[in-house]
Structure formats: C-alpha cells, structure tokens
C-alpha cells in the first residue's frame, strides 16, 4: 500500500494537497448550524445517485411515463426504496437549503467580502427550486400535469412577451410531449450540470474567504 502511495506522491504531491485541505482554520464560533450547507450537498449527492438509478427504467413519454414510474415502484428490485429516497431527499434538500440561507443571512455571511459567495448561493437556491418544479411533472400523473400547466401558464401575465415565454417553456402552445421532454432534459442534464458548476464556484469562494466571523 505504501508503494502505491509513494507512486502517487512522487507524481502528484498528494500529501501537500491533503495537508492544505486538513489544515484549514475553523473559527471557534462554528456550531452545528454551519453544517446545513454540507447537509444540502449530501442530499444533492443522494439525488444524483437515486435519480441516475431511475433513468434506467423511466420513459419520458406522455404515454409511458406514469406506467414506468409504477414499474419502478412495484417491479424493480428496491425500486420503491430508490424512488422514495429520491423524493424524501428532495424535500430534505429544499428544507436544508432554506435553513442554510437563513443561517447565512442571520449571521451576516453575505456581507463584504463575501458578496459573490452569497450571489452564487442564491443562484443555487433558484436551481434547487427548479429541480422541484421540473421533477414534479415527470410521473405525468394528474398532479404533475396540472402543476406543469399552472406553472408554465404564470408567465402569460407578462406584457408583450408572455405568450412567447409560455410557448418556450412548454415547447408548444399546449402542455404535451414537448413539455415533458423539456422538463426531463432540464431535470436530468441541464440543472445537475449547472448545480455542479455553481457548487464548485461556491466551495472555492468559501475556501478562499473562509467562514464569516460571529456577529
């Protein structure tokens, strides 16, 4: 084992990287509430794992989506557990994200010089809510269908461009296959990619600036 370590150490100097990661100063005022962001990240990783597992069985068509979800719940080995964990961790992720935002706001973590960290965090919050909106429609049951119809119909109140925005979201004038395809693409590819990018930026900023001090 030491030979393997020495091989990597000689080429990558991993000990220096490990020392840098483990030697970061942690302020004495930090408590359990400062773990809310990390819990949110953990929920996101659970979402990725369980969501990836379900893509092997889910079919994003208006005629097969609901049946494929039922198949996951009843016929796939531990499918009920995978989907239930996905749903529970989604709710937990939103809750932890909200509590994290409140903690940062109440402790003044958004103030100079951490404005960019706050802005990136707000973007991540919007992405998290978008996960919920897009994922809610994927079973394509009555609840999901009407939720999509209502959510995508909201921009219609915008003057001049409202109808164009609605058509852009739905993929057509009415809710249908194009809408489900777009929401599935957003939920499984676009939003996870954006989350990964902004999370990386968020962590690098925190790493650079450190944790904010007490009030």
From Swiss-Prot:
Protein source organism: Cyanophora paradoxa
Description of how the protein assembles with itself and partners: The 4 large subunits of the cytochrome b6-f complex are cytochrome b6, subunit IV (17 kDa polypeptide, PetD), cytochrome f and the Rieske protein, while the 4 small subunits are PetG, PetL, PetM and PetN. The complex functions as a dimer.
Binding site for heme c: 35
Pfam families in the record: Cytochrome_B
Key words, A-Z: Cyanelle, Electron transport, Heme, Iron, Membrane, Metal-binding, Photosynthesis, Plastid, Thylakoid, Transmembrane, Transmembrane helix, Transport
Compartment(s) of residence: Plastid, Cyanelle thylakoid membrane
Superkingdom of this protein's organism: Eukaryota
Cofactor names: heme b; heme c
Residue intervals passing through the bilayer: 32-52, 90-110, 116-136, 186-206
Protein family per UniProt: Belongs to the cytochrome b family. PetB subfamily.
Listed GO CC annotations: cyanelle thylakoid membrane
GO BP annotation list: photosynthesis; respiratory electron transport chain
Note: Heme 1 (or BH or b566) is high-potential and absorbs at about 566 nm, and heme 2 (or BL or b562) is low-potential and absorbs at about 562 nm.
Binding site for heme b 1: 100, 202
Molecular function (Gene Ontology), one example: oxidoreductase activity
Lineage: Eukaryota, Glaucocystophyceae, Cyanophoraceae, Cyanophora
Co-factor: note: Binds 2 heme b groups non-covalently with two histidine residues as axial ligands. Binds one heme group covalently by a single cysteine link with no axial amino acid ligand. This heme was named heme ci.
Entry protein name: Cytochrome b6
Membrane topology: Multi-pass membrane protein
Functional summary from the UniProt entry: Component of the cytochrome b6-f complex, which mediates electron transfer between photosystem II (PSII) and photosystem I (PSI), cyclic electron flow around PSI, and state transitions.
NCBIfam families for this protein: PRK03735.1 (NF002990)
Binding of heme b 2, residues: 86, 187
Entry-linked PROSITE patterns: CYTB_NTER
HAMAP family: Cytb6_f_cytb6
């Amino acid at each position: 084992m030491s030979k393997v370590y020495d091989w990597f150490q000689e080429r990558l100097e991993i000990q220096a990287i490990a020392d840098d990661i483990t030697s970061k100063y942690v302020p004495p005022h930090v408590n359990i509430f400062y773990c809310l962001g990390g819990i949110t990240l953990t929920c996101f990783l659970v979402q990725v794992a369980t969501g990836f597992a379900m893509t092997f069985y889910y079919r994003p068509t208006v005629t097969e989506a609901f049946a494929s979800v039922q198949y996951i719940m009843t016929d796939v080995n531990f499918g009920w557990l995978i989907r239930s964990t996905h749903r529970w961790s989604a709710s937990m992720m939103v809750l932890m994200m909200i509590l994290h935002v409140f903690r940062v706001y109440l402790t003044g973590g958004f103030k100079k010089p951490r404005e960019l960290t706050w802005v990136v965090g707000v973007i991540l919050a919007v992405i998290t809510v978008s996960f919920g909106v897009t994922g809610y429609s994927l079973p394509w049951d009555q609840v999901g269908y009407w939720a999509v119809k209502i959510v995508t119909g909201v921009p219609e109140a915008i003057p001049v461009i409202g109808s164009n925005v609605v058509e852009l979201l739905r993929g057509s004038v009415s809710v249908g296959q194009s809408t489900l395809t777009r929401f599935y693409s957003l939920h499984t590819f676009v939003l996870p990619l954006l989350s990964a990018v902004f999370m990386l930026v968020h962590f690098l900023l925190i790493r650079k600036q450190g944790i904010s001090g007490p009030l």
